[in-house]
Amino acid sequence: MNVFDRYAPFIQDFIYQNSWESLRAVQVAAGDAVFNTDCNVLLCASTASGKTEAAFFPILTLFTEDMPSSVGAIYIGPLKALINDQFMRLNDLCREADIPVWHWHGDVSQSHKNKLLKNPSGILQITPESLEALLLHKHSYVARLFGDLRFIVIDEVHSLMRGDRGGQTLCLIERLMRLSGSKPRIIGLSATVGDPESAGRLLSECSGRRTVIPKIEAGGVKWRLSMEHFYIDGDGGYEKEHEGEALPELDIATDKAPRNADPGMGYIFEHTRGKKCLVFVNSREECEAVTTTLRRYCEERNEPDRFLIHHGNLSAAYRETAEAVMKDEQQFKTTVTTATLELGIDIGRLERAFQIDAPFTVSSFLQRMGRTGRRGLPPEMWFVMREEQPEARAMLPATVPWTLLQGIALVQLYTEERWVEPQRMDKYPYSLLYHQTMATLASCGEASPAALASKVLSLSTFKQVSQEDYRLLLRHLLSTDQIQRTDEGGLIVGLAGERQVNNFKFYAVFQENEEYTVRSHSQELGTIVMPPPPGEKIAIAGHVWIVEEVDHKRKLVYCDLVKGKVPAYFGQCPGDINTKVLERMRQVLIEDKGYPYLMKNAVARLSEARKTAHNSGLTERPLINLGGDMWCLFPWLGSYAFLAMERFLKLKCAKELGISALDPSRPYFIQFKMKAGEKEFFDVLANEAAKEFDPMELVYKGEVPLFEKYDEFLPDELVRKGFAYGVLDIDGMKSRIHTWTKNSD
């Protein structure tokens, strides 16, 4: 029996009503795996390929044949907005079969949640943080809620398979299974899993089931891709004749930027009017600055505002307004956004995406590109690379267009190799260990040290953590009143621990700044960190406001709307760039080939950079003398191997080589003063790298590198160990030094 015939009649009717001519490859593959095996399933297919329906069509079919006696399926999504969107899509489908769909997160009313608690059934949509809260506060309900749980669907699994948030998701699944007594199958969905086999193993480890990864033939997809370069302080009117060479059918300007506009911003302004577009940026700070600039251009041109804003610090009302406008087929507006619209929220028929500078990963590039190209249109991305004009006497590193090279490298890695970054899980997730220890103890009330260790260390995420490390943690938590010992010898949450566990921010394991809610009269605008004093200006929600009052006790900022332009600040999160990206950037400088998506300014800038690289030898010789005792090292390493190299130079080699004034620009180059010469530099590095040394030796004396949210509650020894063994890529650093040694022989 083919997959379509196996579907329940109401799903077949849904397919007919939507005029689908055939099932997509991912839907056939998913149906076969769900219907004909009892394994987990990892579905890897392009954005907008129908993965959500592929997972739920067979699940709903099985439910109609044998209805679960509790919640039958959990859908875990990384964003509330994604859950809200999927809630609308699934509700229409499930209404036909009388299968309820529930969603549970911070913006959902308590009455909706109470209905689920009284009548556990159907499908529950939830974020990892809300699932944590549910297990913590509704501990006694879990067996009744999920006793007959059959499936857990993890959407955008790549975004939940890295760092502490990924580890938390896996821990939650295991804890849920233990508490409920259920053995659900896991279905992971993603467009950009870099290493499917590794992701499959993680799903298997936390569920005790084998994971199958169907081979899905990807159909040929055409992209519309362009990349242009601008100097930030260049002339306002970039040369119009430079347009149209790469993408002539796309490049007709529909507006005119004001005189003396920032060239890159003007380019975006002129090519978005009358269209539905997204403009992606890499930080919330930049999101505010770009939106404010583009809105100011509308004002100067006496045009109505046509720009929206969407990022994680905005209030739900602002975000949902932007989403609703983007879905409205009659409104042609452009939304400036961060990663919050990178994931699969349905925001309608988008014509074009812009990316200001390069994203940090191939995965992010593909997700952002994939927001367009739906409903019959090809995916379309315009890169806008911006750079400060190098001064005439600038040193070599400042003359290299790093973001342009990075953008080209990301595109080439995927088009040439179909390469995407593998997921990176922390080897020693001690911050998460604290979090799960406190969550486990808070939910069960009291446990003996042995029982607590058994519950927590048996979670697959902590398989590398030793009993000795855990004893060290528990002793420290006792000494800091995070936990207490009862008269009977058991452990309970202590007074200091209660302050953490009872705070709503405890449910999340990702790092948060101390945020202040910003209000103007009765309107909530969003949140900022480190508010300026009254009388100063802030940028939020794409407008400029003057601060009238700051209430530090209640974390509130009151302000009024004004005109002007100020930088916005929300706290920046530097990206994790893979070594393979840096190596491909080097290759871009070496190879003598063009790329069809480069526009004329970008072609000229790349040509100039290649000449600079050739004349200086920076792609052939990693160490370049900048004059006198100033040197620059170009290691072409990713973020964590670069960090290891930087510390290795300071702590292992600086004394012998006479290195001082070391100044890194991560992860591109390291400038420093050095008394030694080039040969001695490489000899010393090779000798030191050949020695066996403890990674802890690359932690500075007295340093306690707090990287993760709960590191502050750990003993210093574990923080240092987690950083040295889990963050620093010492193997990658040593491998690069070995390559230099081999090439010099």
Per-region residue spans from a language model:
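Short, charged/polar, Gly/Pro-enriched secondary-structure boundary elements
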Residues: 232-235, 497-504, 565-568, 676-682
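Long C-terminal interaction/binding lobes of large macromolecular proteins
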Residues: 362-364, 375-403, 426-427, 457, ...
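C-terminal accessory/connector segments of nucleic-acid motor ATPases
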Residues: 418-544, 549-550, 626-640, 654-664
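C-terminal helical accessory/scaffold domains
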Residues: 602, 607-613, 619-650, 672
